[in-house]
Curated annotation (Swiss-Prot):
The modification Phosphoserine is found at residue 165. InterPro entries: ECSCR. Residues 33-66, 124-145 are annotated as: Disordered. May be heavily O-glycosylated. This is Endothelial cell-specific chemotaxis regulator. The lineage of its organism: Eukaryota, Metazoa, Chordata, Craniata, Vertebrata. The chain crosses the membrane at residues 92-112. GO terms for biological process: angiogenesis; apoptotic process; cell differentiation; chemotaxis; negative regulation of angiogenesis; positive regulation of endothelial cell apoptotic process; positive regulation of proteasomal protein catabolic process. Residues 25-91 are extracellular. Residues 34-60 have a biased composition (Low complexity). It is a single-pass type I membrane protein. Keywords: Angiogenesis, Apoptosis, Cell membrane, Chemotaxis, Cytoplasm, Developmental protein, Differentiation, Glycoprotein, Membrane, Phosphoprotein, Signal, Transmembrane, Transmembrane helix. Residues 113-175 are cytoplasmic. Interacts with FLNA. Interacts with the 20S proteasome subunit PSMA7.
Amino acid sequence: MGTVRAARLCGAILGFLLLQGAFGKPSLITEPLSSNTGNSSSSEPRSSSSPASAGTPDTSQNITPISTTMSLRIREDSTILPSPTSETVLTVAAFGVISFIVILVVVVIILVSVVSLRFKCRKNKESEDPQKPGSSGLSESCSTANGEKDSITLISMKNINMNNSKGCPTAEKVI
């Protein structure tokens, strides 16, 4: 169930990164050009109006409709950012996927080690009788996660003393 959630989260993150790369381009504002209402620029020659041409329309200026003539202008207050290329989007996506895979591998290794240690501790506890004087200290060391460290060391020292019945009295000083 956890892997299904992780897969959904990964898909959501990758989708977000791809959408951000696709729509993260700087915005351009289109504004219509101003129409010529009698004021012509200084570079265009003015036609002199003669009495013969007064009744005919002036064809020296080609006036196009405003709706078809559009110019792309960028606002002065906004900064121009370079548009993300497909290489940068792929690099970011690849980095995210690789980091997600590394995190998953670390979590799986930790879970496998914890489960294997629990299985070994349970197997050792079932196979060995804790009442036997010759039992090893391995089964006691598995229960250190419960916070019984002091009693475990005393039990293991007791087992050492019972194994070495005529042995050394200095075993108690080692604690």
